[in-house]
Structures are given as structure tokens and as C-alpha cells.
UniProtKB/Swiss-Prot annotation:
Keywords per UniProt: Hydrolase
Entries under CDD domains matching the protein: NUDIX_Ap4A_hydrolase_plant_like
Reported cofactor(s): a divalent metal cation
Chain ranges for the short sequence motif Nudix box as given in the UniProt record: 38-59
Source organism per UniProt: Nitrosomonas europaea (strain ATCC 19718 / CIP 103999 / KCTC 2705 / NBRC 14298)
Family membership: Belongs to the Nudix hydrolase family. RppH subfamily.
Protein name: RNA pyrophosphohydrolase
Amino acid sequence: MIDRNGYRANVGIILLNSQNQVFWGKRARQDSWQFPQGGIKSGETPTEAMYRELAEETGLQPVHVEILGRTREWLRYDVPACWTRRDWRKNYRGQKQIWFLLRLLGRDSDVSLETCAHPEFDAWRWNQYWVELESVVEFKRQVYRQALTELSRLLDHEAGLGNDRAYREPLEPVEKNRKKSSDTRQS
């Protein structure tokens, strides 16, 4: 669903564990890390799309998570033409996203990256809420900052995650591994 301004409706997911660490997925066959995200299909609500994308990319089901909140407005980023499908280039500018903040109620072992034929991620890890975003593809960094900042208000009182904690801890590379192991996540 591309709107008249050229933005595809999409959802993004910031998933927290019980220590308020954030789930990061390593893009399959790439060196970039990102949050789970994906397009909203025709007839789907953002919440329905979020649960579908969560299941497709992490194997987690609604019973495994609790919704803590979502962004108030659409957050947008433009996609460079070299990253755009050739048949979309005429009408497509980028993504507009509603971001959800979720709490994992299940266990790490509930995460499975192999729930579909072409997994989005080939490794995953937990990391601190505020991290350096160098491992995120450049054109997505600003929207990540916006989503993390807006949704941190839901955790400020509970966990002391004030907005002044500016992206200090870098994501460190890990071994490629389709299945989560103690080597691919930070405790």
C-alpha cells in the first residue's frame, strides 16, 4: 500500500526483554542490524501487521509479548533509488511507519528466525536500549532515533531510560548463525 505521497505503510517493532534490553536482528547475508519491520497489507490494521511481522521475523506469537505502546504519528524515511525495486521507482519515496514497543513475556528460546522460507535475519542479540546506530543502514537511522526517543517515555519512570542517553554503546558483530545461541546474544 503506497500512499499518494509515495510512502509505503509499514510497522516497526522495538522488542524489550525483562532487563529492558532491545532485540536486534542481523539482516540475512548483510552486515547491518535492524529492528523487525514490514509492510501493512491491504485490509490490515497496524496492530495486525505488527503481530504478523513479529511472527514471520522472530517466530513470536501474541501470547509471547505485551504491547507497551506505539508512536502517535507515522514516522517516515526516504529510500535511496538504488535500494528501490525498479518497478516502484516512479511512485515510491520510502516508508511511513507506526512503531510498537513490546515487552517479551516468553523466553529467549521462543525466538525462531527460521519461520519462513526466506528469513529476514540470520542472527539476533539483546543490546542496551540506547546504542550507536552505525550498524543500521544510514537512511533508517533518523527514524530509529525518533522511534526510540518517543517510545522511551513509556520506560523513563520504570527503568531510568531518560532521553539524554544518546546512542553510546555500539552494536558489536557476532558470528553468523541461523539459530540463536549464547554466542549470538548479549546476556
